[in-house]
Amino acid sequence: MAGSTLAPGTVELLWSQIYTWTHEEWSPVDDSDEARAAIASEARELDLDRTAVALVDGEPAAVAFVFDDPGASTVCAESVRRDTPDADEALTRAVAWVVRDAHGRSEHRLAFDGHEYDPHFGPLARRLCLEGARLSLLEIPVPESH
């Protein structure tokens, strides 16, 4: 279902939840006002009509968030929680909804922003017909100056 059909603020809350848990092991989001403001700012850029939410037992289980970026819309997709029941199937439904919607809008390209090691998006991405450049994020520790 389209994110715009949910109660106001729901998709933005889901963005915050998913962003937080997907980054907790390698780049934790702190509980500061600045971090909350940054996540809220990103959430305001979501295209709610094109964002897809998949339900399991009437509750949001996975979301394919869509950002209307120049050149190709960007899709960030994952389950609501790491341990969401039926997350793989729910995520597949959400991504399929976004792809069908893009086709209906005569879009020819979507950019997926995800991590190879995301527990549900990673395996799904390996099954998709992806092409083009892949980006690797490298984190290099900088020694403290004394």
PLM regions with names:
Residues 55, 94-99:
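A short, acidic, amphipathic alpha-helical segment used as a generic capping/interface helix at domain edges
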Residues 80-93, 104-105:
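Conserved glycine-rich acetyl-CoA-binding loop
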Residues 23-81:
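A conserved beta-strand-loop-helix scaffold within acyl/acetyltransferase catalytic domains
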Residues 15, 22, 59, 65, ...:
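Amphipathic alpha-helical "stalk" segments
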Residues 1, 97-146:
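Active-site/acyl-donor-binding loops of N-acyltransferases
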